[in-house]
Amino acid sequence: MEGDAPQRVSERVSGPGPGGGGGGMIRELCRGFGRHRRYLGQLRQNLRETQKFFRDIKCSHSHSCPSSPAGGGAAELGPAGDVAEAPLPAGQLSCIAFPPKEEKYLQQIVDCLPCILILGQDCNVKCQLLNLLLGVQVLPTTRLGSEENCKLRRLRFTYGTQTRVSLALPGQYELVHTLVAHQGNWDTIPEEDLEVQEDSEDAAHVLAELEVTMHHALLQDVDIVVAPCQGLRPAVDVLGDLVNDFLPVITYALHKDELSERDEQELQEIRKYFSFPIFFFKVPKLGSEIIASSTRRTENERSPLHHQLMDLGYLSSSHCNCGVPGQDTKAQSMLVEQSEKLRHLSTFSHQVLQTHLVDAAKALNRVHCHCLDIFINQAFDMQRDLQITPKRLEYTRKKENELYESLMNIANRKQEEMKDMICETLNTMKGELLDDAANMEFKDVIVPENGEAVGTRELKCCIRQIQELIISRLNQAVANKLISSVDYLRESFVGTLERCLQSLEKSQDVSIHITSNYLKQILNAAYHVEVTFHSGSSVTRMLWEQIKQIIQRITWVNPPTITLEWKRKVAQEAIDSLSASKLAKSICSQFRTRLNSSHEAFAASLRQLEAGHSGRLENTEDLWLKVRKDHAPRLARLSLESRSLQDVLLHRKPKLGQELGRGQYGVVYLCDNWGGHFPCALKSVVPPDEKHWNDLALEFHYMRSLPKHERLVDLHGSVIDYNYGGGSSIAVLLIMERLHRDLYTGLKAGLTLETRLQIALDVVEGIRFLHSQGLVHRDIKLKNVLLDKQNRAKITDLGFCKPEAMMSGSIVGTPIHMAPELFTGKYDNSVDVYAFGILFWYICSGSVKLPEAFERCASKDHLWNNVRRGARPERLPVFDEECWQLMEACWDGDPSQRPLLGIVQPMLQGIMERLCKSNSERPNTGLDDST
């Protein structure tokens, strides 16, 4: 193969002291980069599965995503993870997508492999640092020319089964070029191969890097790049070439006591364009021995290098005098001037790699959590849609029918009233109408002032205008009377009916938005009677017939003159000829006709609207099931993995202490210290199948999403142990707050009545908080109530805790505390009230002895059947009457009859005040061990 050459094993570089460039440091570096490779693989796998998840969402629900921009878009996240998308309508999940910025950033992180970049004050010191890192003399350190004349090309060291040297263009192809190293054995790479020859005219040869493959443990997980001399390519350009494909761990080799002006300029350029920390290491002079401790600087002294780097912004006041940063885990620049402390490079590289992985894991987990929240909110919206839409349709039908019947009753009832009202109006307004008619000025008619007669056409026009005046005044009076009769309807339910219709039509196509129009027509029949008169109605035509008779009676052979008396006479004849009873009958008849027509059209359009909703609700229910059964659990597991990766990177895997207890799905251990929390309890859960994995992941998401509350046990974090039980299984380690004991143990030891009632109040407060967050615990029992050293209670084990919209009706919980409706699969948060009632029985009894009704049951099935038939705990002689009534109310068989916890809490406070604060409490037989 081209480039292979015989070589001798290079001489091993003697370390500068214990922990220096020897095997210990190399092993630490290997472990650090190997750990990064494993965690990067986990991140890469999680990202791939997340991308597949979003692709599946898009493919399976693309039909439900609207094409309009208003339909929603990708769930965008801001720099801090804030939401930047518009809310999605219920059921439109295909619009949920991987935010492009986050996806691009994460893809770049997982594609970038680590690389150690060696910069330095000159090429000799860079080569010397490379030899120290590898522990072998690979590069010459004394034969290279001065920095001014140096032509050192870029060097890349990678892993290979054989040592091999070749020239290659970075990231492209290998050059066919004969090297000195190919011509014989060598201890170190020949200087001629390291430098760009001055007489070289081949541009590719000048740009090429020397690639060295070696069988070395460190190179298995990380490449090492030695930057070329500054004359060939500035360090900032070299770094710019690397950052697109590699994650650089930057080292800067020093051999002088101070930075030169050129060094400072180079470092300023790097800091200007990049934010990477740098590991500054002062390489010992060749052949020098370890400096005696007596000649070292005292701890309070800072070297000139330290001051210069502080001025450049690389070091801060938090760094100790040796240049090592404080306890902050975020990567910071580091200065090491003692050669035996080169081992700090492993700490520095760990911080650099960890910072990038943690940031990536956080970004990925933000995407997971944000989309999970969207799913849960969508589940709530879909569940509400499924519940409320049929009720809205029924309400609309009922209320419209009530409106129709009310208006019809008004039309029937008001006919006689309207007749009397018309007569009364005519009598009241007669004088005013005659005066108005006498004084009116005609439009479009020229009346001679000298008393001359007018033509027949002008006469008819004048008579028509007088008639219109009378009719308009009568119209207004009738309309006002009718409107006042139905004002109550608008105030009572018309507004609610309109809003209900609007909500039903909102999710439907515009073409069927006619139901509201028919409702408006029903209302127009009552509110806009005047429009009927002006639009050529039957009433108007009837009036015109009467007016024609008037015209015939008052028309003479010779046309009259238009005088005040004539106008009064015309108006009088018109008023006298009007029949109040016929007018009232005609008005009400027309009102009923319009009502019937609009009512029938409304009913037909409502049936059409109901049919459209029926198909939509069927699709919504299918989608709701997919969200609960597939989408949310699948994404929750990815979220659990990304969050666990973040936790293990920041805090490492916790150490298991002594076993504290065992449950149905896990073992609880003592954990002394983790993530700054002390002491902790660690619950190890080995999910036996996919369903349990999903349930655990959702539980974790709900717990992490909850704000901290003093009545809930804090969850500090999680770690996935892929080698649990010697590698036989995968376990999820949940690290949480450790408390003193559980309520079961507390009752066995003995607690005073006041303490027990306070515990009951604490439990109610905790359950109320869960319900306020939309969660149902579903497993309230003695073992899931923990007590601190002051005997204050906290609720734990949210394993069965779910939002109401995410509950599938599965039968879960502890049989004794399970409400009867749990067996039907249809239940709500009132099951927690039932469970509290049973818990309160134990609290009031002061013992853990089973109730007789439950103790007689031979099996779970027997117990469940008895509970369904109404079996409940018995009343004990020690029970207070009010306490017993509260228990009975809480475990009522009808969920709707159980009291709300907002009512239970003040009742408990009153009981506690009465029994404990009034000094009327009898001495408790149990022991009070609250300490």
UniProtKB/Swiss-Prot annotation:
Amino-acid positions noted as binding ATP in the UniProt annotation, renumbered to this chain: 660-668, 683
EC number(s) recorded for this UniProt protein: 2.7.12.1
Protein kinase domain ranges (all copies): 654-908
Coiled-coil parts of chain: 397-424
PROSITE patterns registered for this protein in UniProt: PROTEIN_KINASE_ATP, PROTEIN_KINASE_DOM, PROTEIN_KINASE_ST
Molecular function per GO: ATP binding; protein serine kinase activity; protein serine/threonine kinase activity; protein serine/threonine/tyrosine kinase activity; protein tyrosine kinase activity
Keyword tags: ATP-binding, Cell junction, Cell membrane, Coiled coil, Cytoplasm, Kinase, Membrane, Nucleotide-binding, Serine/threonine-protein kinase, Transferase, Tyrosine-protein kinase
Gene3D superfamilies the record matches: Transferase(Phosphotransferase) domain 1
GO CC annotations, alphabetized: anchoring junction; apical plasma membrane; basolateral plasma membrane; cytoplasm
UniProt catalytic activity: L-seryl-[protein] + ATP = O-phospho-L-seryl-[protein] + ADP + H(+); L-threonyl-[protein] + ATP = O-phospho-L-threonyl-[protein] + ADP + H(+); L-tyrosyl-[protein] + ATP = O-phospho-L-tyrosyl-[protein] + ADP + H(+)
Active site: 779 (proton acceptor)
Segments for region (Disordered): 1-24
Compartment list: Cytoplasm; Cell membrane; Apical cell membrane; Basolateral cell membrane
One GO process term, biological-process aspect: positive regulation of ERK1 and ERK2 cascade
Top-level taxon in the UniProt lineage: Eukaryota
Listed Pfam families: Pkinase (PF00069)
Enzyme class: transferase
Primary role: Acts as a positive regulator of ERK phosphorylation downstream of fibroblast growth factor-receptor activation. Involved in the regulation of both caspase-dependent apoptosis and caspase-independent cell death. In the skin, it plays a predominant role in suppressing caspase-dependent apoptosis in response to UV stress in a range of dermal cell types.
UniProt record similarity statement: Belongs to the protein kinase superfamily. Ser/Thr protein kinase family.
Alphabetical list of PANTHER family matching this protein: DUAL SERINE/THREONINE AND TYROSINE PROTEIN KINASE, DUAL SERINE_THREONINE AND TYROSINE PROTEIN KINASE
Protein name per the record: Dual serine/threonine and tyrosine protein kinase
Gene name in the database record: DSTYK
